Design a protein with these regions (language model features):
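Helicase motor core with emphasis on the C-terminal RecA-like subdomain
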Residues: 1-170
Length: 170
């Protein structure tokens, strides 16, 4: 479909400049050939960007023997959210997202704008959360990996992964 659209545009405006942008394409030279430009092609690589700071959060509370689901660390997660402008709190399942969100909401004595995002929520509700996040209206979003699927997050100061991620790419 993209190829057909580009061909039609080339027929309508043969001298038009084509610009292809991607943050994730694995082979930029192949993408440049796909654009099928008549003139010269420049591939500009912005580089990997700054190295992320990665740390393991040590909770002040003791880890319970069973049934904890990281809830013993929610006060520490809330304190981390308070110290940043925008935080994403990733969990692995929708059920975890609901539980973590509810615990953080109970701790939220500062009335920080905290939202919930997962695949079982109404599409309209998810879009509202995404738009509020892009505008910078939210201090934190508790979410599953549905939030990282092609969304421009804007400025995110802190990302917290609660529990082990499902895969290495996360």
């Amino acid at each position: 479909l993209l190829s057909l659209g580009l061909t039609r545009l080339a027929g309508m405006a043969p001298g038009a400049r084509q610009i292809g942008l991607s943050a994730t394409v694995a082979a930029p030279a192949d993408m440049a050939r796909f654009l099928d430009c008549a003139g010269p092609v420049a591939v500009i690589d912005g580089g990997p960007g700054p190295r992320p700071e990665i740390a393991v959060m040590a909770a002040a509370a003791r880890v319970p023997w069973a049934g904890h689901m990281t809830l013993h660390a929610m006060a520490d997660v809330y304190d981390a959210i308070r110290g940043q402008q925008t935080t994403l709190v990733f969990v692995n399942t929708r059920a975890q997202a609901e539980v973590v969100f509810n615990h953080l909401w109970r701790l939220n004595e500062d009335s920080l704008p905290i939202a919930l995002h997962h695949g079982s929520l109404d599409v309209g509700q998810r879009r509202k959360v995404e738009a509020a996040m892009v505008r910078g209206d939210l201090r934190a979003v508790v979410c599953t990996s549905t939030l990282d699927l092609g969304i421009d997050w804007g400025a995110v100061d802190l990302v917290i992964q609660v529990g082990a991620p499902k895969g290495l790419s996360r």
